[in-house]
Design a protein with these regions (language model features):
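N-terminal presequence-like segments and the immediate start of the first folded domain
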Residues: 1-58, 62-75, 81-142
Length: 142
């Protein structure tokens, strides 16, 4: 079973809601999740930042579940903000989803725009899953 070691070296400033270093040992498999945005399954886009952040994290959970993984397996997230001033709201939302005692490594980036003009936020993730954990859902191509 892999071990995730969450480390914050004393020679680096204290992190705010993330971990500086996550060391994941094998045997395990790595899951890469493409950027998830605030679009619900029915195609509706959430109208404000908080709702988009929540929907993005719900979509992330669903994507991980399809790979037999969960948020507890996430070792790194990258967050894209159209307006970085929303980071405090994101932190509130994020802390409802991730273990605040051992959060994943994290990067926040302000960008000019996302793929659709209504989108305000996107999150992508890397997860390390123990071999044999969870059921992988395989979807047939149509």
């Amino acid at each position: 079973m892999p071990v995730h070691r969450f480390q914050n070296p004393p020679t680096i400033h204290a992190p705010r809601g993330y971990t500086h270093v996550v060391d994941a040992t094998t045997p395990s498999r790595t899951v890469y999740v493409s950027g998830q945005v605030g679009i619900a399954q029915d195609g509706k886009i959430a109208t404000d930042f908080r709702a988009q952040a929540v929907q993005s994290l719900e979509n992330l959970k669903a994507a991980l579940a399809a790979a037999g993984a969960g948020l507890e397996h996430v070792v790194k997230i990258t967050n894209y903000f159209v307006d970085i001033s929303h980071i405090a709201i994101f932190r509130e939302v994020r802390d409802r989803y991730f273990d605040t005692k051992a959060p994943p490594a994290s990067t926040a980036v302000q960008i000019v725009k996302l793929a659709m003009p209504e989108l305000l936020f996107e999150i992508e993730a890397t997860a390390v899953v123990p071999d044999g954990a969870g059921q992988v859902t395989t979807l047939a191509k149509t």
